[in-house]
Amino acid sequence: MYKEFAYIYDKLTFDIDYEKYSEVIKKELKKLAIKPKSILELGIGSGNMTKYFYNSSLNYTGVDLSKDMLEICADKFHNITLINEDLCQLQLTENYDFIFSTLDTINYILDSEKLQNLFSNINENCKGVFMFDINTPYKLIEVMGNNHFVYEYEDIFYTWVNQYYEDDNLIDFYIDFFVKNEDNSYQRIRENQTEKVYSLDAIRFMLYNSGFNAVKIIDFDTGKSLEDYTQRALFICY
């Protein structure tokens, strides 16, 4: 994922309010009286969320499958440990006060058994709290569904076509980017992605089965209670 277009990824996330999401997370950390000295960020990408939690005095580790994205992240932060690894293959060797993952990284894990194992692995190495978000079934089925979208931003034009497979609880994203070059020609970059539709109850069950004693779920966009139309749900687990 994000192979060729890693270098334009930051520009393509212009409409994501990272600061708002970080404030929701910080509010939940404050409620639990957790001031983490060690942080593990899963699916760190190019570090767009990282800047709201990182400082050089922390033991900060980030994991991502994309080497290209990690190279961008490494240019932004010093004194940070970056691991190029599939989350489901990750072997954690130390404990962390705070483990988190944002922007539907969990939805990209298509095998429920692998996700269950990941949660168990995280529980064993989490001394404080684990937080992550998912795209809800409402968003993936009702909002995204079999729809298509067209976007234009600065020198980038792109189309986004979805295909939802109800029997498999999967949704494919077919994204075509057209990036304007200096000579006014366009470079086409195609990216195909797949997300799994997980019910909130199924995720909750896996978390309890992994050993977490408490699981709280809120609307990540509002920081408040879940609604029928919640598109992004934040899980707080400890």
Per-region residue spans from a language model:
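SAM-dependent methyltransferase
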Residues: I134-A202
